[in-house]
Amino acid sequence: MVDLTPVIETMEHRWMRAWVNGDMRGLKAITAKNFILLTGSKPPVILDRASWIEGAAKRYLASSYRFADIYARGFGGIAIFSATLELKATMDGRDWSGLLFVTDVWRKRRIGGWKLVQRVVSKPDDTPHLAKAIKSLQLWKA
């Protein structure tokens, strides 16, 4: 089985750099036509591709980013990427910087290669006991 982690990480950085650099053409090139961005807010909100790209170009402006705690997994022509994302950004001139958790779904096309089809964005839960409690359910020891 091929490890898709380096391929998908590269695509993630291409996508984020396009946003940071205001390269909407580059962003469009690797964003699927049926892309959605789903926020883990209350209530959840969905943006389609056109809304996301318009917002990223004019209102929600990123200036830098850093991924950490990266997890990637491939399933043939589908790949999942999850990571914490430290983002410096503004929305309508107001600071929107912070730590996020993103889960992205990538699909490989015969023509055009890998395209981002979905991004789910939420705030990480830093409740101290949560990670420990979930980890205690693991049947293996890491």
What are these model-predicted stretches?
Residues 1-30, 36-142:
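A beta-strand edge to alpha-helix "cap/lid" segment located at domain peripheries
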